[in-house]
Amino acid sequence: MRRSTHTRRRLLLGGLGLLGLGSLLAWTSLPFGAQPVSTVAVTRADIESSVTALGTLQPRRYVDVGAQASGQIRNLHVEVGDQVHKGQLLVEIDPSTQQAKLDAGRFSIDNLKAQLAEQRAQLKLAQQQLKRQRDLAAVGATREEDLQTAEAQLNVTQARIDMYQAQIRQANASLRSDEAELGYTRIFAPMDGTVVAVDAREGQTLNAQQQTPLILRIAKLSPMTVWAQVSEADIGKIQPGMTAYFTTLAGGKRRWTSTVRQVLPIPPKPLDQTSQGGGSPASATAGATGSQVVQYTVLLDVDNPDGALMAEMTTQVFFVVGQASQVLSAPLAALDDSDNEGLRLAQVFGRDGKVEQRKVRTGLSDRLRVQILDGLSEGDRLVIGAPAASGG
């Protein structure tokens, strides 16, 4: 029994020795310094060259509703999110001051009309007196002075009538202005849309004498406009009408497709330098050294039938510069720069195990792959990270 155990132990030790010897022989048979080669194949793929930018969503159409009349807000009939229709009553301002002014204007007109009626009566009397004086003068029964006085009285009365008529016309014009001011105390929706902001409250006093107080904003949430900020280096590639698409943080993988409507000719600046209007976000950002990155604003519109797009959402925009479908392509990492413009260098791994360097003409490129126009064939294996080969 003990002898059998010693025999098995000798056999086990002998097998381990033979295994170690075989490994040593295999290791010494490999070429010294040989390294594994990583390769990728030239395949067909869809290539899309694009310019990326960040943007902000804004309603294409909106209006800020302000107050043209001063006074206290008596009733505010809408809240943020309410749907409104053109002509709908939104706000009522206390009309006491405007109503009193209108009443005073009407009373003034009544007074002027009464004085006008009096002068017309005086005109009739002056006409009768002048006729009497002329009749008497015809038979020499009155003085010339009395005749002249009657004529002057008639002219004065007619002038007063003209004056009161002019004053009534002036008062009527003021009355129309007062009526308009009274109408301003009732504010109506200028268009259909959604109330997206309310900046006033019931009981708040408005002063419209110096500037127009803003009360609320109404916007149409379809279509929406993306205000995209494109860097100075890329703005030359952007043209009106070119295809673009964008994503939002809330939309996940959903894409919205559109076309460029407009490229604004100057970059927006802070309000203390110039006023851009239109809800344009600032696009010049200062770095730690105080230098500014110049960015230009590009506008594109998109329909929003389901309301998934909301104001102030951040978007990532892709402006499609070029597209190619199922073309020969290779990873950018597999190509090196060349001295010749438009040509790249590729290390092709042959079937014989040798590496051949080729000059490759390329086309469109995205962030990962580049289109192969000439120099490579489908199925070629390209070496990644290998030293430059001879030939080519």
Swiss-Prot record:
Part of the tripartite efflux system PvdRT-OpmQ required for the secretion into the extracellular milieu of the siderophore pyoverdine (PVD), which is involved in iron acquisition. This subunit is an adapter protein that stimulates the ATPase activity of PvdT and connects the inner and outer membrane components. The system is responsible for export of newly synthesized PVD after the final steps of biosynthesis have taken place in the periplasm. Part of the tripartite efflux system PvdRT-OpmQ, which is composed of an inner membrane component with both ATPase and permease domains, PvdT, a periplasmic membrane fusion protein, PvdR, and an outer membrane component, OpmQ. Residues 109-181 form a coiled coil. GO terms for molecular function: efflux transmembrane transporter activity. This is Pyoverdine export membrane fusion protein PvdR. Predicted to be exported by the Tat system. The position of the signal peptide cleavage has not been experimentally proven. Keywords: Coiled coil, Periplasm, Signal, Transport. Belongs to the membrane fusion protein (MFP) (TC 8.A.1) family. GO terms for cellular component: efflux pump complex; extrinsic component of membrane; macrolide transmembrane transporter complex; periplasmic space. PANTHER family: MULTIDRUG RESISTANCE PROTEIN MDTA, SLR1207 PROTEIN. Residues 1-36 form the signal peptide. Disruption phenotype: Deletion of pvdRT-opmQ leads to reduced amounts of PVD in the medium and decreased growth under iron limitation. Deletion of both PvdRT-OpmQ and MdtABC-OpmB systems strongly affects growth under iron limitation as well as PVD secretion. Induction: Expression is stimulated by iron limitation. One of its GO terms (biological process) is xenobiotic detoxification by transmembrane export across the plasma membrane. It comes from the Bacteria. The gene is pvdR. Residues 267-286 are annotated as: Disordered. It is found in: Periplasm. Its main location: periplasm. Pfam families: HlyD_D23.
